[in-house]
Regions:
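A generic short-segment signal for beta-strand/edge and adjacent turn/coil regions
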Residues: 1, 28, 42-45, 105-106, ...
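Glycine-rich phosphate/diphosphate-binding loop of Rossmann-like nucleotide-binding domains
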Residues: 2-63
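Glycine-rich phosphate/nucleotide-binding loop
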Residues: 70-74, 78-166
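Glycine-rich, charged/polar anion/phosphate-binding loops
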Residues: 13-15, 58-70, 79, 129-132
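Solvent-exposed alpha-helices and their adjacent loops that cap or buttress functional pockets
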Residues: 19-24, 48-52, 65-68, 126-130, ...
């Protein structure tokens, strides 16, 4: 329901302000384009409602904005959000596997991979889900962090640290 997604935007705004320290979090609705009228009935209704709020609503955002830093809170329904999250989680694994494969038989590529080590580790910290551990379940009475079903020890530890800071 549109009302639920508007509530998600409000909770995301509060989380970004009070936990992430963002003064005016930029909020967007995930859609298939940034142009007016894009999306399905649900996203168009949510867009119309959020446009009338005091939130710093910037309009529709696309999948490419998930990790861009251009938006602080991306609003979508749970199914779409879960699919987007799983794509993002797989991104690092895919990039890392391709880099290793390409460096396998080529001495120049191996040298470049070695020289890029620090940058690759920084990229991994940004894209590896275990670095974050989990995501807070907002709107419940208490602290709750949801972890990936295949979380490793590092992810669980980071989820516990996240929960302790909520």
């Amino acid at each position: 329901k549109p009302f639920h997604l508007v509530q998600f935007a409000m909770m995301g705004d509060a989380y970004a302000k009070y936990i992430l320290g963002k003064d005016e979090p930029r909020i967007g609705v995930l859609s298939n384009g940034e142009e007016e009228g894009k999306g399905n009935e649900l996203t168009r209704e949510v867009h119309a409602i959020l446009s009338e709020t005091d939130l710093n609503y910037i309009g529709y955002v696309e999948g490419r904005d998930l990790n861009s830093g251009e938006v602080d809170v991306i609003v979508c329904d749970g199914f779409v959000g879960n699919v987007a999250l799983k794509i993002s989680e797989g991104l690092w694994e895919t990039i890392h596997a391709i880099l290793r494969w390409e460096a396998r038989d080529n001495i120049r590529a191996k040298a470049a991979y070695f020289l890029m080590g620090r940058a690759i580790r920084r990229l991994e910290k940004r894209l590896d889900y275990s670095e974050y551990g989990g995501a807070p379940l907002l709107g419940v009475n208490g602290n709750c962090v949801i972890c990936h079903g295949s979380s490793n020890g590092k992810a669980i530890m980071n989820a516990i640290l996240l929960a302790s800071n909520l």
